[in-house]
Amino acid sequence: MRAILCNAFKGIEALGFTEVDEPRPAANEVLVDVHAASVSYMDYLMSCGGYQLRPALPYVPGTDAAGIVLACGDRVTRFRPGDRVSCGNWFGAFAERMVARESSVALLPVNVDFTVGSTILHTYLTAWYALIERARLQAGETVLVTGAAGAVGVSRPQRRNRRSR
């Protein structure tokens, strides 16, 4: 299958298209036919070697994707082939197919486009974690979002509005 491969921690200059073996899902993983993958700052940092996690080289970058489940590991119970999903992994999304742990996969409603679905997990969950888990935001509190043009920043007001209803 075709994928983008990172051969050295030198940023986007070290990325290139190539053929790689299709991943196989472990017992707790799903194999996803990737219809869209998002690019995040974390992906960039990882390709430069500037993120706290450094995958073994070479590796297929990309943390978030959306697509259709092709196969499920033996212990997967929440998904089946044909399901539309949003999924995340530390790497592997910049390929035609990727694997993700069942716990890092969410069903994607039919009215949500794959391109939108590929941005949901890390950005929205980062915003959720910051506002709800860390800041312990309560209904009626005011939130100032700096850097609202980025993916996480855009998701914060949306999460805040939904939470206050």
Please place each PLM-identified region on the residue numbering.
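Conserved S-adenosyl-L-methionine
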Residues: 161-165
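Short, flexible surface segments
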Residues: 27, 78-81, 139
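N-terminal Rossmann NAD(P)H-binding glycine-rich loop of SDR-like oxidoreductase domains
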Residues: 149, 157
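NAD(P)H dinucleotide-binding glycine-rich loop of Rossmann-like/cofactor-binding domains
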Residues: 45, 84-147
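Residue-level recognition of beta-strand microenvironments
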Residues: 6, 23-25, 37, 72, ...
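N-terminal glycine-rich beta->alpha transition that marks the start or flank
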Residues: 11-12, 20-66
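Residues forming the Rossmann-fold NAD(P)(H) cofactor-binding site
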Residues: 154
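A glycine-/small-residue-rich N-terminal strand-loop-strand element
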Residues: 47, 66-90
